[in-house]
Each structure stands twice: as C-alpha cells, then as structure tokens.
Amino acid sequence: MEKPKLGALKDPEDKRDYPIKAFLKAKVTVLPTTVDRSAGLPPVRDQGGEGSCVSFATAAAKEYDEKLFSSYFSPRFIADRIQLDADSGAYPRDAMDVLLREGVCPEECQPYVARIHTDSCLK
C-alpha cells in the first residue's frame, strides 16, 4: 500500500459552530483510558497517492451511518466535488455539505482511481 497523502484541512471558523461545552450538561469525572469501536466500522481502504483522506473518511462515515458493510459509497464522487486537484486537500465541512446537498453514489457508479499530481503536468 502506497503511503497516503494527508489532505485534510482545518475548517475555517464558522459562527454556526458550537463549542462542545455547550452540549455537556453533566460533568464526567471518569473516562475509560481506551475505546475501540473498530469492529463496527467499514474496513480501511487504500486511497493511493492522492490526498483524498477526507473523501474516504466521509464515505466511510456514511457507510457506518447506514450500516452498509457489503458495498461502498464512492470517495471519488465526494473528492470530485471538494478538491481542486489531487494535492489540494479538502475541508471536512465541504465533504459533509456534499452529503447534505447531493448525497453520494455507490462505488460501482463512480469507482475510485487515485489521481496523482506530477510536476510534468505543469511544464
């Protein structure tokens, strides 16, 4: 497996964001030292050399939400809507906006193929 590029960008501040403290009513004094929820998650997939981790994470979150483990949603569908190019990175908020406004198609409708930027494209 090729070493994946990390393309997640920190979302810009948005006045609609709420600090977590706003939702915590009771004080939690004891937390477990570890939590492993991996048994309920889709398997890790290979994004190749493209910085498309946000697209893969978003597709996997939707698969988890719908308990869809026998097939995949298309990270390519999401990446094509939120990335300028293979190396531009992406904001998680933009990926969530794609799910909200457009949904996401199954992998078989738009298969993922990594798009790798090379300097030869700039010449």
Feature-to-residue mapping (PLM):
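N-terminal zymogen propeptides
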Residues: 1-36
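Predominantly the structural core of cysteine protease catalytic domains
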Residues: 1-6, 31, 59-63, 82-123
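Generic secondary-structure boundary/loop-capping signal
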Residues: 32-34, 38-42, 75, 101
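A short glycine/serine-rich beta->alpha loop
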Residues: 39-50, 82-86
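Alpha-helical support elements that line or immediately flank enzyme active sites
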Residues: 47-70
